[in-house]
């Protein structure tokens, strides 16, 4: 009987690996471990943010699905507005969204004006932090929700602290709560391909001396580590018409990004009552890309003169949605974004509100 040829070290390693992979799949199911080239999830799906500039800065066209995103910044900087725009974009794509309002401060009428289909949005106003995170966990595990927003981490009060007396300290209670929640949620979020957004506030570090930022976010360090994307949103300018304030200029910095290069920035206007100004962004980015021509204070698109002054051009594009959609289509094509689907006209939205 012929002797079986001896295996080379490399062949022995390959055979041992194949045996291990077979055992793992038999024990934990197909797909428990795979080669990267066999994975169907190399391209990370995303939900648009409602801002073309921010979609570009994020590198994948929006916030990643199946990951945790943190949006933080000072008060009245546009954190909740940005989160509501993401919900609206998710709903336009046919998704289901949930808003966990731990602050008990959601303005439903404002959300509707931003384009959120409020009758279809799930909302919860929990009494304490454990309840809020348990609701988020159950929604994610269902696999039927596309985006879950928790507003905000600072309002996730541990039950022990809530039941204690006023002024009684619970050292590290919120940090422990968030650390446990992150460990429990991360794997489920990836499997269900749900985008979970935590809105957070900033605090000043006590006794900060020397170098480094004096600011920090609430809830400990767990969220910083587990979040795939962290967005720092700041109001950098107040928009005024003579003496009347009508909005603010905001800068969003991608301070952490595990799915694309980080530290990119986006600038856009947030107008009071209407949210992120799509038209203002189209003007700025259109001029930068050479799609909109700017000569002095005059703006033009091809042979069409749009007007004099940025505010007048923005008003013109709000009225002439066909021209606005043409500019956006060309801009998205220039940036290499997916096919543009125009949002419903204000008339259609008014009819739906009246139903």
UniProtKB/Swiss-Prot annotation:
One of its GO terms (biological process) is DNA repair. ATP binds at residues 73-80. The keyword Mitochondrion does not apply. Transmembrane segments: none annotated. The keyword Nucleotide-binding applies. GO terms for cellular component: cytosol. It is found in: Cytoplasm. Its main location: cytoplasm. Gene3D superfamilies: P-loop containing nucleotide triphosphate hydrolases (3.40.50.300). It comes from the Bacteria. Keywords: ATP-binding, Cytoplasm, DNA damage, DNA recombination, DNA repair, DNA-binding, Nucleotide-binding, SOS response. InterPro entries: AAA+_ATPase, DNA_recomb/repair_RecA, DNA_recomb/repair_RecA_CS, P-loop_NTPase, RecA-like_C, RecA-like_N, RecA_ATP-bd, RecA_C_sf. GO terms for molecular function: ATP binding; ATP hydrolysis activity; ATP-dependent DNA damage sensor activity; damaged DNA binding; single-stranded DNA binding. NCBIfam families: tigrfam_recA. Belongs to the RecA family. Can catalyze the hydrolysis of ATP in the presence of single-stranded DNA, the ATP-dependent uptake of single-stranded DNA by duplex DNA, and the ATP-dependent hybridization of homologous single-stranded DNAs. It interacts with LexA causing its activation and leading to its autocatalytic cleavage. This is Protein RecA. The lineage of its organism: Bacteria, Pseudomonadati, Thermodesulfobacteriota, Desulfovibrionia, Desulfovibrionales. The gene is recA.
